[in-house]
Structures are given as structure tokens and as C-alpha cells.
Amino acid sequence: MKKTTLIKEGKAKRLYNTDEKDLVWVEYMDQATALNGKRKDHIAGKGELNNQIDCILFEQLVAKGIHTDFVQKLSNNEQLNRKVKIIPLEVVVRNAASGSFQRKFDVSYLQAFDQPVVEFFYKSDELDDPFINTNKAIALKIIDLEESQRLEKMALEINQILKERFAKAHLQLVDFKVEFGKTADDEIVLADEISPDSCRLVDLTTKESLDKDVFRKKTGDLVTVYQEVLNRLNNSQEEVHG
């Protein structure tokens, strides 16, 4: 397996073609962004931490039957994925109030929901990723009704698996963002990444933030926090596999 030409460089990853046409080589970068990329910082070690966390979580999801683009971990900051066409929607699942939801509806921080809230956002940095409902997504031919139902069902299944996995690491999954893509045979699969860049995590007891919010709000050291998440996931691996 060889890495060949660069496909694109995003906010946190570089994607490369390989000598196998259906596979893509993903390299995680030492870059942190906020405000849809308007703020950028180089943070040494971040790429390796995100990749390792992502691989642990995707391996868990695959083991539980979730269809994904993940193939294998290549190194501490690289992995191999199936090539997919990304659906331009960010699917957000919320288990408790935080972030924009908390501000918009003026509710208490970490107020728990009786059932998870699933939201779609149109994936566009230029438009600041606006909220979009199912009818609008269908009107814009981003997805059809059956696909919207499939995305919501998969997102809720992923949420349940992640909640249980993080709980074993003494972490509460407050909310998270995922993206989906279509394979060459039109199968919808989970794609992109799951890491503290895309999840809100707090300690189960102290409610201390252990995610990218420490970078957004400048309240802590991102590498220290991400290393703590990785350590907790690694330390709870034996229990998961036991």
C-alpha cells in the first residue's frame, strides 16, 4: 500500500490517494481550529492524539455492527479509510444542553434530555454551517426522506454505543457531531472522525470539560486534555474486551 497524490487538506486532516483506487490515506495534522476555521493554532501532538482516539472509537463502532469508512490504523497519526462521497450534512446528537443549544433556548448547562436530540446542519464554512431541517435538505436534494431516516437511525445507534463506551472511561458524552458518506455502491456509512474535536465530553463526577471547548474558551491545555481522554479510553479497553 502506497500513499500517492494529495486529494485535499482540511482543517485537521490531509487526504491522499493510494495505489488502490477505493482507499484513501488519512493524515491527522497538528492543527486546532475554532469559529469555522477563522482561528487556527499549531499544536504539537494533537494529530497523533486525535487519530488514536478516533481509531479506538471507530473500531468499537465497527465491532458493534456500524458500517463505516474505517479500514485500519496505519500509524499514530495516520489511518486508512474507504473512499466515500461525503454527504454535506453535519449530524449532531445531543444528550444534554450545552453550546449553541443552551444559548438558543436559555436552559441550564448539562440539563439532561429525556431522549437524544438529533439535528442536521448544512456543511458550509461560508454559510457558517446553518441549521437545516429535513424538508429543506430534501428540497435542496442533499438527501431524500429515506436517507434522512437512515441518518437519524444510525446517529442514534452510534450515540448509544459511544455513551456506553465513554461511560466506561468515566466520561459523559454531552453531544457530538458526525458526518456520513456514500461508497461507490451507494451505501451510506459513518465517515470523517470522532474525537474530542467533534464531541463534548465531561468528567462523570466533576463535570470538568475534556474536549475542544478548552481551546475554544481558552480554559486549559488541549494536548493535556486530549491525552487524558486517550489514557482513559486505553485504560478501560480491557474491561470492554473482557
Curated annotation (Swiss-Prot):
Protein name as it appears in the record: Phosphoribosylaminoimidazole-succinocarboxamide synthase
Keywords attached to this entry: ATP-binding, Ligase, Nucleotide-binding, Purine biosynthesis
Name of one Pfam family that matches: SAICAR_synt
Coiled coil (UniProt feature): none
Species this protein is from: Pediococcus pentosaceus (strain ATCC 25745 / CCUG 21536 / LMG 10740 / 183-1w)
InterPro entries in the record: SAICAR_synt/ADE2_N (IPR028923), SAICAR_synt_PurC (IPR033934), SAICAR_synth (IPR001636), SAICAR_synthetase (IPR050089), SAICAR_synthetase_CS (IPR018236)
Keyword Manganese: no
Enzyme Commission number(s) from the entry: 6.3.2.6
GO terms for biological process, alphabetical: 'de novo' IMP biosynthetic process; cobalamin biosynthetic process
Involved pathway(s): Purine metabolism; IMP biosynthesis via de novo pathway; 5-amino-1-(5-phospho-D-ribosyl)imidazole-4-carboxamide from 5-amino-1-(5-phospho-D-ribosyl)imidazole-4-carboxylate: step 1/2
PANTHER family, per the entry: MULTIFUNCTIONAL PROTEIN ADE2, SI:DKEY-6E2.2
GO molecular function, one term: ATP binding
Catalytic reaction annotation: 5-amino-1-(5-phospho-D-ribosyl)imidazole-4-carboxylate + L-aspartate + ATP = (2S)-2-[5-amino-1-(5-phospho-beta-D-ribosyl)imidazole-4-carboxamido]succinate + ADP + phosphate + 2 H(+)
Stated family: Belongs to the SAICAR synthetase family.
Gene: purC
